[in-house]
A protein has these predicted regions:
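A short loop-to-beta-strand scaffold at the N-terminal edge of the catalytic core in hydrolase folds
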Residues: 28-37
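Active-site loop/oxyanion-hole signature of alpha/beta-hydrolase fold enzymes
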Residues: 30, 74-123, 133, 138-139, ...
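Conserved HGGG/HGGXW glycine-rich cap/lid loop of the alpha/beta-hydrolase fold
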Residues: 36-88, 106
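Active-site glycine-rich loops that stabilize anionic/oxyanionic intermediates
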Residues: 51-54, 122-123, 152
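Flexible "cap/lid" loop of the alpha/beta hydrolase fold
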Residues: 133, 137-183
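Conserved alpha/beta-hydrolase catalytic His-Asp/Glu region
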Residues: 181-246
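Conserved serine/cysteine hydrolase catalytic core
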Residues: 225-273, 282
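Catalytic histidine-centered segment of alpha/beta-hydrolase-like enzymes
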Residues: 262, 283-299
Length: 315
């Protein structure tokens, strides 16, 4: 990255620098970075899966809260392939199903016993649903709850801002990104200084600290073009209705911002119809970036689910 893009990333604050453990898991030749807080032998592990063009760092407000509130719970975060510190494979190797496989590889390596709660934000929502659908029975039996944040169980391009991905113009843009990646980087570099104010309009609907908006913009800028292109088709067409049968036993929450333009309320209501045990909650006046924009809503959902499970025996 050069110029404005480099400056955007250089000046941003770094998070998850004080983790208890960190490492990499090999997933068919792709290294997936993971981060842990809390005891390795914890009875309950909360797994947090971030969204498209983000990274595990996007949950820093949740880890800060949960470490203080629930010191006996283990927190496991990871950078999805193509994001953060994980390897950046080719566009053809980026999809929701492959990302879910990566998560399952990390869980198989790191979480051998105890209850598991899975939280997915944005693209991490469909990825977490795919994890549930693909999980081996032994792991599925230990899943004790789930939280879907600004998520979708149907195609992301079916409604909201994501419909832009299904237009002819978007296809032309992504064809250009795929065919001329070096030119794409130059284009992205030239507009990097404009990203933050655009995000303030499109993603953040509540008044939000400028540092958090610039942090979000920097994460997007740090995402390689091949990752943007690779997940493009799945963002348009991927759906996880096949995961619905495995949701039926689980308690949990579906959270959505009242003014979310990316995954509108209708998407969360659709999840709720497939998952009758979930509590559907709307963050008043908020947009798509609830972990940063409305962190108390996300923290409260995890807190309530942990308290709900506190009296239940672990497996």
């Amino acid at each position: 990255m050069l110029g404005r893009g480099r400056a955007l990333s250089k000046r941003r604050k770094r998070y998850l620098t004080d983790v208890d453990r960190r490492g990499f898991t090999d997933s068919h030749g792709v290294r997936i970075a993971w981060y842990e807080y809390g005891p390795e032998d914890a009875e309950t592990t909360v797994v947090l899966i971030h969204g498209y063009t983000l990274a595990a760092e996007s949950f820093h407000l949740q880890t800060e809260y949960l470490r203080k509130r629930w010191p006996g719970v283990r927190l496991l975060l990871m950078d999805l392939r193509g994001h953060g510190m994980s390897d950046k494979p080719s566009a053809a190797q980026c999809s929701v199903d492959v990302a879910a496989h990566d998560v399952l590889r990390v869980l198989a390596e790191r979480v051998h016993t105890g209850r598991v709660i899975v939280l997915g934000h944005s693209l991490g929502g469909p990825v977490s649903l795919a994890v549930l659908r693909r999980a081996p029975q032994e792991l599925y039996d230990r899943v004790a709850g789930m939280i879907q944040v600004s998520s979708a169980i149907e195609e992301l391009a079916a409604a909201g801002l994501a419909r832009i991905l299904n237009t002819k113009t978007a296809h032309l843009v992504f064809d250009f990104l795929h065919a001329k990646p070096r030119g794409a980087w130059r284009l992205r570099e030239r507009i990097a200084g404009l990203i933050a104010p655009v995000l303030a309009i499109g993603f953040f609907m509540r008044e939000t600290d400028d540092e958090l908006i610039e942090f979000h913009a920097a994460l997007i800028n740090e995402t390689p073009t091949r990752t943007l292109v690779g997940f493009f088709d799945d963002l348009r067409v991927h759906q996880e209705l096949a995961a619905a049968p495995r949701l039926q036993k689980l308690p949990g929450f579906v959270l959505v911002g009242q003014k979310d333009l990316v995954t509108p309320i209708a998407q969360s209501e659709r999840i709720g119809r497939e998952w009758p045990k979930a509590w559907l909650q709307m963050a008043h006046g908020a947009g798509h970036m609830l972990p940063l924009e409305a962190p108390k809503s996300v923290n409260a959902a995890v807190d309530r689910l942990l308290r709900h499970l506190a009296g239940a025996p672990s497996r």
